[in-house]
């Protein structure tokens, strides 16, 4: 039983076997998280700023398996918090099989010049992206094709849940559930997922020049940073920063195909031009939050470096 306490209104809603309390008068601070001064890229649209209550609704939706056809898969099933909101599996498991591409990490999705989403950039915004997996036959099953119910069936399902009646009213002023409202809430939560506590951030804070050596880096780490940042050429670097732009390490919107042409299901996949941020590619022990690339074909960062060295 999950309990809701909101502005004097108490409601009990059965969502899981776990006991939890959500007090809408004491929300987690999503809107006012500290962002370093040197982070100046933000794809948040003016009509959907992050709010504490909006991101709270988005978080509940993100973790709710009832958003899938058979109530077995949530957004978090493929975008796992412990994997930088990505997946350790090459292909994620949906309601009707495995996905055709590796699940992209969501860390720092907000802090980027690129506004399009998915590996092939088919979604024009994060808002538009959030409900496409829900409407995918394999992923969450509200496709409206191949015998699946369509999204209106999910809207009806969510509308009947008392928890969502309370939350949608708190966010939007009425309990009406629509795709657009779900998109806005989910996008607010995803944009609230941020990471700026790395060794790089500590170095940049004391030496605010991405091309200078950082005093907290080892000699090898500073060499790696120079190789990453410097353009290719005699005595130059690898030019990684031309596409993965410091200090956010988001993908340049003008980046082309990266030369990885494989597909999880076999054959070629030539439409991929996007990348997640390179932040949180490993955990605090140095283990990769991988595998990497849209086809999950590279298990280690050394595999990635060797790929680019060969093309």
What are these regions (language model features)?
Residues 48, 144, 154, 172, ...:
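Short, flexible active-site loop motifs that bind/organize anionic cofactors or intermediates
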Residues 1-7:
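Sec-dependent signal peptide recognition
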Residues 109-110, 116-160:
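Glycine/proline-centered hinge or cleavage motifs at structural transition points of membrane proteins
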Residues 151-170, 174-197, 297-311:
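C-terminal capping alpha-helices of c-type cytochrome domains
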Residues 120, 140-146, 166-172, 180-181, ...:
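Short coil/turn segments at secondary-structure boundaries
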Residues 19-132, 199-310:
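Short glycine/threonine-rich turn/loop motifs
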Residues 10-17:
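Hydrophobic h-region of N-terminal signal peptides that target proteins for export
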């Amino acid at each position: 039983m999950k309990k809701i306490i909101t502005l004097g209104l108490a409601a009990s809603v059965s969502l899981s076997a776990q006991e939890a309390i959500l007090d809408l008068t004491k929300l987690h601070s999503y809107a006012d998280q500290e962002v370093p001064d040197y982070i100046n890229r933000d794809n948040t649209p003016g009509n959907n700023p992050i709010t504490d209550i909006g991101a709270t609704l988005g978080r509940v939706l993100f973790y709710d398996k009832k958003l899938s056809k058979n109530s077995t898969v949530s957004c978090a099933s493929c975008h796992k918090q412990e994997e930088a909101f990505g997946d350790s599996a090459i292909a994620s498991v949906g309601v009707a099989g495995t996905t055709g591409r590796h699940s992209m990490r969501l860390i720092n999705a907000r802090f980027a010049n690129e506004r399009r989403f998915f590996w092939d950039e088919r979604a024009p915004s994060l808002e538009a992206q959030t409900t496409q997996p829900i409407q995918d036959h394999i992923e969450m099953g509200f496709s409206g094709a191949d015998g699946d119910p369509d999204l209106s069936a999910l809207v009806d399902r969510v509308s009947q849940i008392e928890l969502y009646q309370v939350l949608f009213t708190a966010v939007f002023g009425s309990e009406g559930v629509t795709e657009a409202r779900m998109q806005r809430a989910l996008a607010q939560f995803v944009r609230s997922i941020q990471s700026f506590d790395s060794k790089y951030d500590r170095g940049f804070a004391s030496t605010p020049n991405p091309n200078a050596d950082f005093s907290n880096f080892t000699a090898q780490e500073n060499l790696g940073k120079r190789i990453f940042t410097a353009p290719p050429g005699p005595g130059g670097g690898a030019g990684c920063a031309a596409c993965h732009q410091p200090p956010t390490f988001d993908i340049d919107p003008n980046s082309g195909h990266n030369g990885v042409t494989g597909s999880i299901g076999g054959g070629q996949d030539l439409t991929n031009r996007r990348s997640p941020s390179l932040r949180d590619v490993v955990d605090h022990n140095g283990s990769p939050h991988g595998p990497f690339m849209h086809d999950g074909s590279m298990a280690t960062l050394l595999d990635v470096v060797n790929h680019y060295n060969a093309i």
